[in-house]
Amino acid sequence: MMQRWVLLLAMLVSVAGFALNHYASQSPDSKSTHTSQSEFSAERAFDLLARLLGDESPHPVGSAENARVKDEILTWLAEQEIDATVQQAWGCAHSGSRCAWVENIVATLPGKHNGPYVALMVHYDSVPPAPGAGDDGAGLAAVLEAARLLKASGPTQYPVMLIITDAEEAGLLGAEAFFKQHDLRQQISAVINIEGSGSSG
């Protein structure tokens, strides 16, 4: 009798654990584009991703389509009244075997204090055979929606920087150019890099 009770209890705990795990792993419902401007909206980010991707052509570094994506990002940042500049520089791999002319977008949001920046980093170029929706378009759209929210919510404690690099797929060349050459590179206390890591999970 005791063994049956223990077995039943173990089964009940297992089922409850499975149900709790299943519930905890569910994504929350996404917020619509009509959600308050003071909240993050996945649907707003998805709409922005569609705008950035255009006709879904690949946009590797140096291509006309990559220039279009860059201009679309700059237009969107201007619409949000977020200050942005373009760093134009040669970016080279450590070995010097690969170099490219890169156009990184650097945007800043002021904070209540003048302390170092917290940087959100993402890239906008794609690999040559794909439009880059997952790597790194979705990350880019999420970072831009987060920036919109931060701007709408008023200043954060410390300033925030968006580092939107070019030529990531060619070997992190945009990041190399930023961290070796940009005037603000030593005014950053933390970097949160948002990178595509596949589309299967």
List where the protein language model places each region.
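Hydrophobic membrane-insertion alpha-helices, especially the h-region
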Residues: 4-21
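N-terminal capping segment at the start of a domain
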Residues: 18-70, 80, 124-126, 199
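Solvent-exposed, acidic/flexible segments
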Residues: 38-45, 59-70, 99-100, 117, ...
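Extracytoplasmic/secreted proteins, especially bacterial periplasmic and envelope-associated proteins
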Residues: 44-51, 68-79, 84, 138, ...
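A non-catalytic alpha/beta surface segment that caps or lines the substrate-entry region
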Residues: 50-110
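Proline/glycine-enriched tight loop/beta-turn segments at coil->beta junctions
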Residues: 111-117
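Short beta-strand element of the alpha/beta-hydrolase
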Residues: 117-123
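Acidic/histidine-rich catalytic neighborhood of metal-dependent amide-processing enzymes
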Residues: 126-201
